[in-house]
Amino acid sequence: MLTQHSNIDCYVSTFVIRIVQKSGGGFDLTFTNPQNGMFHLSCTALISAMGCRERTDRQVFIHGDRPSGVFTAGQAQTFINLKGYLPGKRFVILGSGDIGLIMARRLTLETASIGGSVEGVYEVKSKPSGLTRNIVQCLEDYGIPLHLSTTVSALHGTGRLEGVTVTQVDGQMRPVAGTERYIPCDTLILSVGLIPENDILDSLAPVMDARTKGPQVNQYMETTVQGLFSCGNALHVNDLVDYVSESGSIAGERAALRCLRAGFAGNSALPKHPTDISICA
C-alpha cells in the first residue's frame, strides 16, 4: 500500500466525531476506534474526501407497506460482489442512475440459471440519468425495458415484498390518475441518486452549494473555510472516477503546500457570486 512506503499513519475502523477550527489556524479532530478508544489529532490542513451516500426509500416518499426486500443499488452490489448472496429473484429497479443500470445487467446474469428476471427499470424523469453507454450495454443489450416518466408509488407485501404499484407522472412529476399498474416482484432496487456526505463539517460552517450539495471551492479545491479542502464525491457527485482522482490530486497538493507554508494563502480566488456562474449539468 502507498501508506506503507510514505510514512503516513493510516487508521482503519476509525470515526471522526468532532472537528473544531483553532483560532490560530488549523483544526483539532476527535476520533474513536476499538484499538485506541477516543483520541485527538491536530492538523494545519484538512481534506474532506468522504464520498457520498445513497438516497433511501424514505427520501423518495414511496407509500404502502414496509416489507423486507427493498435495497439501494449499493446494498445489492455489496450482497452480490462481497458476500455472494442474491438479494432476490424478481426485481424492479427504480431510477436509472449508473449503479442501477449496472445492477440490472448483473442481476439478469446472476439469476438466469434460477429463472429470475429484472421486470423493468422505472425512471421518474423524462430522460434517463445514467450514461448512454450503460443504457445500451446494460439494458438494450439484455432486453430490459426502461420506462420513463414512471415511478414506484406504493409497496405491497407482508413480511417480504410481493409487488409494487407503478404510476406515470406528468411534466411536474405529479402522478397521473388511472395509470397505476401492479408489478409482481420480490425485490425493489433503488437507484435514486447520491448525496455528498458532509454532515461532519457542519461545525466548520463552509458555504454549501445548493445545487451540488457540496461545499463551494476555488480552483485549488479549498472551501470558504481556510485550510479546509474538498474533493471527489464529497464535493459533488462525479460520473467518472477519473474526475474524482483529478480533484483529489489537486486538493492533496494544495493541502501539502499549505502545510509547508509555501502555497496560495487566503480565499481571494473564490468567486464572490459563484451561484451566478452557469454550469453544464
Question: What kind of feature is each model-predicted range?
Answer:
Residues M1-R90, V169-G178, Y182, I189, ...:
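FAD-binding core/adjacent interface of flavoenzyme oxidoreductases
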Residues Q75-P128:
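Rossmann-like NAD(P)H-binding beta-loop-alpha module
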Residues F79-K83, P128-I135, N218-M221:
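Short, charged, surface-exposed secondary-structure boundary motifs
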Residues C231-I277:
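A conserved FAD-binding loop/helix module that cradles the flavin
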